[in-house]
Amino acid sequence: AGYIVLCDRYKFTAFARDTVRGCSPDWVRRLYSFAALPDLTFFFKAPLDVSLGRILGGRPRLKYHEAGMDLGLSSDIEESFKLFQGRLLKVYSVMKSEFGLIQINANQPIEKQQEQVRQRLAGSIDLGQYELDKLS
């Protein structure tokens, strides 16, 4: 309590991935129950082709597990990625209502996404109560 923590991914990523891979949603939630629920969680949603393009724009190929190749959805890694991500999106859709995830359209310009995040933060957290530590 009394701290602001920003992180990329959290227990919700494990909830989605483990559930899609066949684990019981209740079991996964109990497994990660030690991790506190955040006050705010943003879910950045982009079309699958946009997500794929962003990944491949930064490296030459998809990773085996991020494409869901372990599930045997398709022998084509890009097709498997799309099928796997589609399943993840369904789980995130359920978690949106269950945990109050705030969906941001990740197909917008980054400045617009940042503006929306800042507006939600400003409406939920009084940043003025936190003092930044000075680095020596």
Q: How would you describe each model-predicted region?
A:
Residues G2-I4:
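Loop/turn-to-beta-strand initiation segments
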Residues L6, L40-F42, I102-I104:
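Hydrophobic/aromatic beta-strand patches that form the interior of the parallel beta-sheet core
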Residues R9:
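Walker B catalytic acidic pair
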Residues F12-T13, I110:
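Conserved beta-strand edge residues that scaffold enzyme active sites
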Residues A14-L88:
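A glycine- and Lys/Arg-enriched "phosphate-lid" helix/loop adjacent to the NTP-binding pocket
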Residues L56-S136:
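NTP-dependent small-molecule kinase module
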